[in-house]
Structure formats: structure tokens, C-alpha cells
Amino acid sequence: MTITGKTRVTGIIGWPVAHSLSPPMHNAAFEALGLDFAYVPFPVAPERLAAGIAGLAALGVVGFSVTIPHKVAILPLLDRIAPEAELIGAVNTVAVKEGILTGYNTDGIGLLSALRSKLGFQPEGRSVLVLGAGGAARSAVASLGLAGAGRVEVANRSLDAGRGLAETMGERLPGTVFGFQPLGRVSDKGYLSGFDLVVNTTSVGMAGDGFAGLDLSALKRGASVYDMVYAPLVTPLLAQAEVVGVPSANGLGMLAAQGEAAFRIWTGAVPPEGCMEKALAARLATPGNP
């Protein structure tokens, strides 16, 4: 990559951000299309967020990704917020055009794309169990509701968080039935048989741990499992799904698809099919990476 005075800059802000897999993913797509763009990590401490955002805009950055811990804190610093980002209550992508900063959330787009491409799953009228009630769960629940899911149930250790998420989405998306249960309910005999899809939005699996008592063999025929975790590529949840013959996929496809959506927002171009996911897989295969 050769950077000149004409190179258009994109990047990612977070704290920390050195571990991010987004730079190789986006730069691979820029290179494949011959676009004079570059994507770089910008470490921005929480107490410097406002100054950092103003600086990026002043320097003419085309846009940037937003990761932990800034996805919510950035909201009041933006000029406009896209409807889906407003519903989710978090932003992971910002476009800068003529000094106007517009916030988007492409996580939901990424999830829906991955569900369709990896599992052939269409949410319309289907029942989905979402494990967790944090930021990733919020984007999942919102996107599934917007896509017409018939029923979305949130299972979480903190019942208050699960209830709050379900009730909020129920008020905003009346076309979908939202419910909540304590996480321990997933081990109850027969409970899983009511769902077409199970989505893990938590960090469970990253350290080789699993969900106690969760028996995927109880899922009905044709049901699927999606795990947002992508490191390791095969979590205990996915390993169990393979053993019992349940179609499943890891979070790599979602990570690539949300990046593709951000790429389109910034450039107006479509990344070559599979380019970003291949770059991610290559980086993950490099020793010392997540």
C-alpha cells in the first residue's frame, strides 16, 4: 500500500484498539478494488473522545468504525443517527461528509447477512432464542425484529437486563413478540424445542467454556445455532452442535458482513465477495492473534 496526499483515510477508534482485526479486512478490500483508501487504528481514550472525534472530522477522515468503549458514548457527539442505530442505542460506523457526522450500526446487517449466507436462515415469522442481553444482544434482537421474526426471546443471567431489552424492543417493534427468561431456563427439558434458531451474543466460549446444561439435541429438526464468537473458530457450543447434527456457524461471517456494510457506506463500492472474510481468516491464523 502506497499512501499519498490523495489517499482517503478511514479507520477505527477504540481503547484499546491495537488488537482490532478491522484494518487487514478493510485494507484487503481497498487493495482488491484498486481504491486509494487506507484504514488505520486510532487509539482514543474515553476522556478524549470528544477531542478525538473533532480531530478526525477536521483532518478530513472519510469515516471510521467505533468499538469498545465508545459505541454508546459517541451518540451525543454526532450530527445525525440512522434509525437502526437509534433503535439499538449504539453506533459502530460513522460517515463524515461535508463536516456532517452520521452514525450507523451495521452489526445487525452483519448478523442477518451471516444467518442467510452461512445457515440459509430467514427470520420472517421464525422463533429465535438470544443468549445474552448486552450490546451485541441488543443489535441482534433489534435486527431480528426489524426483519420480521415472529418471536424473539432473551435469556440472560441478569433478569432485569433481559426484561429491559425485551420490553424496550416490544414497545418499538410491535410486530414481533419479545420475551425474556433467566439463562438457566435453557437447560429445562423441552424449552429449546420451541426455537428455530439459537444465537449466542455473549463472550461464553472465548475461553473454552460452555453453557451449563444446554443440550442442543433438544432443538427441533431444521433448527440452527449461530455463535458470534470467532476466536476460537470452534467454540464448545459449535462443537456440540456438530456432534448432534445441528447446522451452525461462527461469528467470522458476521464480522466480515458488518465490515462490508461500513465499506459501502464510506466508498459506495461493494467489496469483492469473500475478500474480507478471507483476510480475517488469514489474520486469525497468524500466531499471536486472537
Swiss-Prot record:
User: Which superkingdom?
Assistant: Bacteria
* Catalytic center residues: 71
List the InterPro entries hit by this protein, alphabetically.
Aminoacid_DH-like_N_sf, NAD(P)-bd_dom_sf, SDH_C, Shikimate_DH, Shikimate_DH-bd_N, Shikimate_DH_fam
Q: Which Gene3D superfamilies match?
A: Leucine Dehydrogenase, chain A, domain 1, NAD(P)-binding Rossmann-like Domain
What GO biological process terms are annotated to this protein in UniProt? amino acid biosynthetic process; aromatic amino acid family biosynthetic process; chorismate biosynthetic process; shikimate metabolic process
Kindly state which keywords UniProt assigns to this record, in alphabetical order: Amino-acid biosynthesis, Aromatic amino acid biosynthesis, NADP, Oxidoreductase
Metabolic or biological pathway, per its Swiss-Prot or TrEMBL entry: Metabolic intermediate biosynthesis; chorismate biosynthesis; chorismate from D-erythrose 4-phosphate and phosphoenolpyruvate: step 4/7
Q: Which cellular component appears as one GO term in the record?
A: cytosol
The protein's GO terms of the molecular function aspect are:
NADP binding; shikimate 3-dehydrogenase (NADP+) activity
**Catalytic function, reaction form:** shikimate + NADP(+) = 3-dehydroshikimate + NADPH + H(+)
Residues that coordinate or bind shikimate? 20-22, 67, 92, 107, 230
Known EC number: 1.1.1.25
Q: Which residues bind NADP(+)?
A: 132-136, 228, 251
Family listed = Belongs to the shikimate dehydrogenase family.
What this chain does, per the entry, is described as: Involved in the biosynthesis of the chorismate, which leads to the biosynthesis of aromatic amino acids. Catalyzes the reversible NADPH linked reduction of 3-dehydroshikimate (DHSA) to yield shikimate (SA).
Q: Subunit arrangement? A: Homodimer.
What is the name of the protein in this document? Shikimate dehydrogenase (NADP(+))
* Gene source species: Geobacter sp. (strain M21)
Which gene is this protein's source? Answer: aroE
